[in-house]
């Protein structure tokens, strides 16, 4: 039986048209479609279970705002995890990854960063990766980030990405390394009749 509920804020960042909205749509609805560019921000949510913990992933898609070279800080304020996307076949989209990683670490130093290469299906069909794997690894090491490659078209690694984000967060919370981003109200013990606030995952 689930004993604990946690709200986990996730933000998606990246160059225009790398497929951020497609990732969210694939994950939350299981569907794929070539979507139009989102202006401003869009919000979606989905519940996952990690052990005895129920995690509500609140997913903020910041599509469109990257046109101004700076995302409004309010989008990722108090975020627990950030998915920084780039198109595996597009070098220009990769050049923005460092920009977003710097923005995040300066404004939310406790945030966990996931560098996600999109459109993996194109690579599997014969396209060439625009960024050498070692360069991606070096950038990930610099920001202590995780690396994923996904395809919204086939769904490959999309669910795994979000499940890993939830699991990593619960591990950090249990270890005391990221106490719900200094916001204990994110965690609610639902094992008693009166819902009592608590500071970590069970």
Swiss-Prot record:
Record InterPro entries: P-loop_NTPase, Rab24, Small_GTP-bd, Small_GTPase
A Pfam short name: Ras
Subcellular location: Endoplasmic reticulum-Golgi intermediate compartment; Endosome; Endoplasmic reticulum; Golgi apparatus
Any single biological process term in GO: intracellular protein transport
Gene Ontology MF annotations: GTP binding; GTPase activity
List of residues binding GTP: 14-21, 61-65, 118-121
Bridged cysteine pairs (disulfide): none
GO cellular component terms given for this protein: autophagosome; endocytic vesicle; endomembrane system; endoplasmic reticulum; endoplasmic reticulum-Golgi intermediate compartment; endosome; Golgi apparatus; membrane
Lipidation (S-geranylgeranyl cysteine): 201-202
Keyword annotations of the record: Autophagy, Endoplasmic reticulum, Endosome, Golgi apparatus, GTP-binding, Lipoprotein, Membrane, Nucleotide-binding, Prenylation, Protein transport, Transport
Family matches, as CDD domains: Rab24
Annotated motif Effector region, positions: 35-43
Main localization (coarse): endoplasmic reticulum
Function recorded in the entry: May be involved in autophagy-related processes.
Family label: Belongs to the small GTPase superfamily. Rab family.
Record-given protein name: Ras-related protein Rab-24
Organism: Dictyostelium discoideum
Lineage of the species this protein comes from: Eukaryota, Amoebozoa, Evosea, Eumycetozoa, Dictyostelia
Gene: rab24
